[in-house]
Amino acid sequence: MPKIDLFNQNGEKVGDLQLADSVFGVEVNTYAMHQVVKALLANKRQGTQSAKTRAEVSGGGIKPWRQKGTGRARQGSIRAPQWIHGGIVFAPKPRDYRMSIPKSMKKVAMKSALTSKVNEKLMVVVDDIKLETPKTKEVVKMLNSFDAKKTLIITNNAEENVYKSARNIEGVQIIPVNNINVYDLLKYDKVVITKDAVSKIEEVYA
């Protein structure tokens, strides 16, 4: 069963935390993570791109000049792709990019992402993060104590003061545990997570 250091928000070690082997100690499945990230990014695409092909552009029904005798290259239509305002070759059309991923694969990918962060010592567990008033300086101080720059902060509840304090820090994103996804876990170099959020993850994914 993986064991990880437990810190307070001042960066001081206050104990150890046993992590569930079934969530934070699984065999990392890179294929599952790749598929889930690919699906997440694909599902964000609008798919509204559109351009006209040669057949759809207006005009160009008449030959611009006769075939021979002008000294110029032969042309059949002013809407051919080589002309300005001509049609687009293989023009993009609106399409649905959505991918569906089995729930079991999503679960495997999430566990793999969490395990990889623990294995690479890129996860920091904090007993709690509390601020009486929004203070960006306090969050920066906490992150500096963990040598965390490009960081994902995961809390059990959307603590308003903490959220307001972290939202303007470059390279830092703060989300409630209910909104975690594989892409964000892999995108950020380090994960700072509260003890309660860890318990919530184990409750859902164990």
UniProtKB/Swiss-Prot annotation:
GO biological process, one term: translation
InterPro entries for the chain: Ribosomal_uL4, Ribosomal_uL4-like, Ribosomal_uL4_dom_sf
Pfam families for this protein: Ribosomal_L4 (PF00573)
Annotated GO MF terms: rRNA binding; structural constituent of ribosome
Gene3D superfamilies named in the record: 3.40.1370.10
Alphabetic keyword roster: Ribonucleoprotein, Ribosomal protein, RNA-binding, rRNA-binding
Family named by the database record: Belongs to the universal ribosomal protein uL4 family.
Subunit structure: Part of the 50S ribosomal subunit.
Free-text function comment from the UniProt entry: One of the primary rRNA binding proteins, this protein initially binds near the 5'-end of the 23S rRNA. It is important during the early stages of 50S assembly. It makes multiple contacts with different domains of the 23S rRNA in the assembled 50S subunit and ribosome. Forms part of the polypeptide exit tunnel.
UniProt name for this protein: Large ribosomal subunit protein uL4
